[in-house]
Amino acid sequence: MRLRTALLATTLMAAAPVAANATIITGPYVDLGGGYNLVQNQHGHFSNDPANASMLTKSSSQYRHDAGFTGFGAVGWGFGNGLRLEAEGLYNYSEINHRAPTAATGVTSGHDQSYGGMLNVLYDIDLKQFGIDVPVTPFVGVGAGYLWQNVSPTTTRYSNGNVSRLGGTNGGFAYQGIVGAAYDIPNMPGLQLTAQYRMVGQAFSDGPFTMTSYTNGVGKSVGHAFFDNRFNHQFILGLRYAFNTAPPPPPPAPVVVPPAPTPARTYLVFFDWDRSDLTARAREIVAEAAQASTHVQTTRIEVNGYTDNSAAHPGPRGEKYNMGLSIRRAQSVKAELIRDGVPTGAIDIHGYGEQHPLVPTGPNTREPQNRRVEIILH
């Protein structure tokens, strides 16, 4: 019942609803945890002959444990793809409260502990690949290492007055399976709360424990004790910190809808060489400018005439002629604006002759883009 209850508690914590992005570790991290340790009944073989290492033909009993506690610390490295490697040191403790069967009824008391190290390989499961965007990362892992089992002087007092004591320290190969989940603590990048279940197994002990029997308070014999597999079921809460975790990205900037394009406020009307009359295309452009003046806030319309620097008589005479030509072009555009409904008083005209060319040229050069009138809405 205790095992089922602890498993349910771990599952519920891992499934708690949350909302944010989960952390996949890249780089170094540290991990600490502690919790509940439940040791399965452990089978021991005993011999009263200290020289006889074969236990299979001698007596045997099972030792039963009360619930204890466990703790671990680990340092590791995450590869950014869910895979992690870590080195771990761990400690387990439990009380021994029963031994059976025995030759006579009795009461057993004592405790044992195990400690050592593991190398673990773990994998973090990114839930986003399944369309689940929460700050929880489930993980699974396996580990292997070496554990020492220390049995304190564990005493069995029989109803007939005899006493047996078991004690010693021996080590052996150990392994573990891990399943759990990590929750990203809000506003603390890299820090996670972890909940996990571990099954820690120890296949054998590399040497015997000491078994001493007493009768009427006097040591009667000293022998060996060997233990079979040892299994720990552990339910652990902990904290993990990843050092290279960047803070979460800022929320996306609100989408700014660009304003609707405003009508052009400058219009260009082009002329043939040495001409001031409007072409059909020029009349269309003037009409667009006249219509735009009614849709935007306009206080006045400036009409500026220009020429290129070509002339039949280059020099001052040509410059004077071009100045007059630029004014006539501006007057032609003004007259067309008035026909299109623009009030006369809103129009100012200027002639600049060869000044302010759109396209710089050499002297006495015919350039179509410089033969123009600019309509500017103010």
Curated annotation (Swiss-Prot):
Keywords: Cell outer membrane, Lipoprotein, Membrane, Signal. Induction: By cellobiose. Disulfide bonds: none annotated. The keyword ATP-binding does not apply. It is found in: Cell outer membrane. GO terms for cellular component: cell outer membrane. Residues 1-22 form the signal peptide. Residues 258-378 form the OmpA-like domain. Growth enhancer. This is Outer membrane protein.
